[in-house]
UniProtKB/Swiss-Prot annotation:
Homology family: Belongs to the glycosyl hydrolase 13 family. GlgB subfamily.
Provenance organism: Prochlorococcus marinus (strain MIT 9313)
GO cellular component terms listed in the entry, alphabetical order: cytosol
Keywords, alphabetical: Carbohydrate metabolism, Glycogen biosynthesis, Glycogen metabolism, Glycosyltransferase, Transferase
EC nos: 2.4.1.18
Protein name: 1,4-alpha-glucan branching enzyme GlgB
InterPro entries (UniProt xref): A-amylase/branching_C (IPR006048), Branching_enzy (IPR037439), GlgB (IPR006407), GlgB_N (IPR054169), GlgB_N_E_set_prok (IPR044143), Glyco_hydro_13_cat_dom (IPR006047), Glyco_hydro_13_N (IPR004193), Glyco_hydro_b (IPR013780)
Length: 756
């Protein structure tokens, strides 16, 4: 054994470490070969004594260069598993040396793929990863911050002091450090010092778990523990074409569906109560449900309603409840409001076991300015554009991703793969696609920048969306990718290889606006607006449309669905029944927002929950039963969904009876030859001898009637069905003379086995 000596460069490096300005601690710390011997240097701020424990020997370490750099000289390589005994503030503990692990974590191919934007599993390298290295347990941290002067890991185990664990700069703007002793559940952040000397504390962009708001630290979490039970579901999903399946979606917000009392805590498996997460200050005494509680309550409820999918408004971690989840700071973490990532995995697993798909809202269009988030991440506009004319949504107070940067696109595309792979979700709905596609979205003249061709189209965002959808379907062919796109941008649901955006469904915003405008009218005036309810068919096959009555239509003074309707209470419910039945029989997949299924009477409030007490009353119970039966009927009739996106699947009988506000049409299914006749009367006046033409003679069974008394109607109808007459109308030689109840939709099926 030899003695350490004073070196000027070590003194200088020690000063840089103390000032948190060092980007290459491995050049100084850990085992260093020097003139035929090995010098072990330990960086231990504020320690009074350090001893090296190696090969069964204890060696006192000295501080010849800096009071916080402890050194010992050895005659042989100590390896990497040695420990140090540290005395600090009178407390002694033993630990392994972070700087003993010099080798790079991010490989050359990883760096290459990330730099070109094509590392679809980059989260397997970025973030905080629990691992064992040569028998030493700890956490590997990896961060992208190319313009930072220095980066350090802050955490519970180092007193949130950035001087303790400076990270090593690697190629490509990456920073790495393996810290022995950090465990699952450890809170941490990154301390980023900019070239200008400013210091920011940032949550991990790739963090797999974060603290419950208002706290903002990341949490070390394990990705490989949960044992999935949905192999059959996943195999079947990826083997079928989602577009020729029935899709009926219950859109909902986990935090405002139903609350529990704070004095009734969730009990963990070990019998201890979990600390409640308050719903909001506006509702004292209420707490949010946990993922396990939601699995017990929400899943049976949605299954009983007959929906095929649950759509969750954004559940990526977000600090502000009032953003509804659309201002994300934790892209790789389900929100901790409701529990752990594994508990969310179990929620999805349970959905699949009960036959329900899971769709999540995904928000790649913008992000908030919160100090712990992505904004100005390394002292530069790293994730966002520097020019606010292209990098900021002023009306929303959010920033726009710089889609021209490969690493930023990689962050988002890999995030998409992450949610499908790690959480087995079945689909995404991309929010506010129009805000991504147009550079002048919500911007006055002079406050936006034209593209390279002088146009308003955001070509960078277009290429990003195409890449994201291409990668998604490459990995998960049975997935759903739904665009909320409110303009007439062409080919939204066309494949990327022919110039489309690559989604497989698009919300039909035009249909939604036309329907609500029509149904809000006094029924007498509807005769002058028949085009509102028929126009959607003329463009129904230009995209793969999903019909949606979403959360956006029951907030901000727009009232609830029930109170949008004219007339007395009975007429309001009848109008809603007719609207929903027309929606379910119209071409396109279906989505409605929570509360609409039973007639919520107030606007949606993110800080409250639904008015479940209304189900004590018959009209609300009747509407809920209507939705139950609509879903059951819909799923059992291939004519209503098999050919949603083929013109063969729909045929008008008559769309021109403006005077009576009546429409009639057929839904058809090509492979099985089945078809249905749908007749809708959108006035409060019933008709006892209303005639429509039909293509075949025989008996037509009335298989659905929204005026049934079990739904709250008056039970008018056609006594179970009608025979045809040889009366030529609507271009058909055969016709039916029907009773049409007020504000109703009727569905008939031809029964060839029943004689005239």
């Amino acid at each position: 054994m030899t003695t350490s000596v004073a070196l000027d460069w070590v003194v200088q490096d020690g000063q840089r470490l103390a000032e948190c300005r060092h980007d290459d601690p491995f050049s100084l710390l850990g085992p260093q070969s020097h003139e035929g011997q090995w010098i072990v240097r330990i960086w231990m701020p504020e320690a009074s004594q350090v001893e090296l424990l190696c090969d069964g020997r204890t060696t006192a370490m000295t501080t010849p260069n800096h009071s916080w750099i402890f050194e010992a000289a050895l005659n042989q390589n100590p390896g990497r598993t040695y420990q140090v005994r540290v005395k600090r503030a009178g407390i002694v503990h033993e630990q392994h040396d972070p700087w003993a692990f010099h080798d790079e974590w991010m490989g050359e191919m990883d760096r290459h793929l990330f730099a070109e934007g094509n590392h679809h599993h980059i989260w397997q390298r970025m973030g905080a990863h629990l691992m064992e290295r040569e028998g030493v347990e700890g956490v590997m941290f990896c961060l992208w911050a190319p313009h930072a002067c220095s980066v350090a890991v802050l955490g519970e185990l180092n007193g949130w002091d950035g001087r303790h664990h400076p990270m090593q700069r690697r190629q490509g703007g990456l920073w790495e450090l393996f810290i022995p002793g950090f465990k699952e559940g450890t809170l941490y952040k990154y301390e980023i010092r900019t070239q200008e000397g400013h210091c920011y504390q940032k949550a991990d962009p790739y963090g797999f778990q974060h603290e419950v708001r208002p706290a903002t630290s990341s949490v070390v979490a394990r990705l490989d523990r949960y044992q999935w039970q949905d192999e059959q579901w996943m195999r079947q999903r990826d083997s079928r074409n989602a577009l020729d399946q029935p899709i009926s979606v219950y859109e909902m917000h986990l935090g405002s569906w139903i609350h529990a009392a704070t004095d009734e805590p969730y009990i963990e498996l070990d019998g201890t109560p979990r600390a409640p997460v308050p719903a909001a200050d506006m509702k004292p005494g209420a707490r949010l449900l946990t993922y396990p509680e939601l699995a017990d309550q929400l899943i049976p409820y949605v299954k009983d309603r007959g929906f095929t999918h649950i759509e969750l408004m954004p559940i990526s971690e977000h600090p502000f409840d009032g953003s509804w989840g659309y201002q994300v700071t934790g892209w790789y973490a389900p929100t901790s409001r409701f529990g752990s990532p594994d508990e969310f995995r179990a929620f999805v697993d349970r959905c699949h076991a009960e036959g329900l798909g899971v769709i999540i809202d995904w928000v790649p269009g913008h992000f908030p300015k919160d100090g712990h988030g992505l904004a100005f991440f390394d002292g530069t506009h790293l994730y966002e554009h520097s020019d606010p004319r292209i990098g900021e949504h002023k009306e929303w107070g959010t920033l726009i991703f710089n889609y021209s940067r490969n690493e930023v696109r990689n962050f988002l595309v890999a995030n998409l793969v992450y949610w499908f792979e790690q959480f087995h979700i079945d689909g995404i709905r991309v929010d506010a696609v129009a805000s991504m596609l147009y550079r002048d979205y919500l911007r006055p003249d002079g406050e936006w920048i034209a593209n390279e061709d002088g146009g308003r189209e955001n070509t960078e965002a277009v290429r990003f969306l195409q890449q994201a959808n291409h990668v998604l379907f490459q990995h998960f062919p049975g997935a759903l990718s739904i665009a909320e796109e409110s303009t007439t941008w062409p080919m939204v649901t066309q494949p990327t290889d022919i110039g489309g955006l690559g989604f497989n469904l698009k919300w039909n915003m035009g249909w939604m606006h036309d329907m609500l405008d029509y149904f809000e009218l006094d029924p007498w005036f509807r005769q002058f607006h028949q085009n509102n309810i028929t126009f959607s068919i003329w463009y129904a096959y230009t995209e793969n449309f999903m019909l949606a009555l979403s959360h956006d239509e029951v907030v901000h003074g727009k009232s609830n669905l029930l109170h949008k309707m004219p007339g007395d209470d009975w007429q309001k419910f009848a109008n809603v029944r007719a609207l929903l039945a027309y929606m379910w029989t119209h071409p396109g997949k279906k989505t409605i927002f929570m509360g609409m299924e039973f007639g919520q009477r107030s606007e949606w409030n993110v800080w409250g929950d639904l008015q479940w007490e209304l189900l004590k009353h018959d009209p609300h119970k009747g509407l809920q039963r209507l939705v139950d039966d609509l879903n059951t009927f819909y799923k059992g009739e291939p004519a209503l969904w098999k050919d949603d996106f083929d013109q063969y699947g729909f045929q008008w009988i008559d769309c021109n009876d403006n005077r009576h506000s009546v429409i009639s049409f057929m839904r058809r299914e090509s492979s099985g030859g089945t078809w249905l006749v749908v007749v809708a009367n959108f006035t409060p006046q019933s008709h006892s001898n209303y005639r429509i033409g039909v293509p075949m003679s025989g008996y037509y069974q009335e298989v659905f009637n929204t005026d049934s008394s079990c739904y709250g109607g008056r039970n008018l109808g056609n006594m179970g069905g009608k025979n045809t007459d040889e009366f030529n109308i609507h271009g058909y030689e055969q016709s039916l003379e029907l009773c049409l109840p007020a504000l109703s939709v009727l569905v008939f099926r031809h029964d060839p086995k029943r004689s005239l």
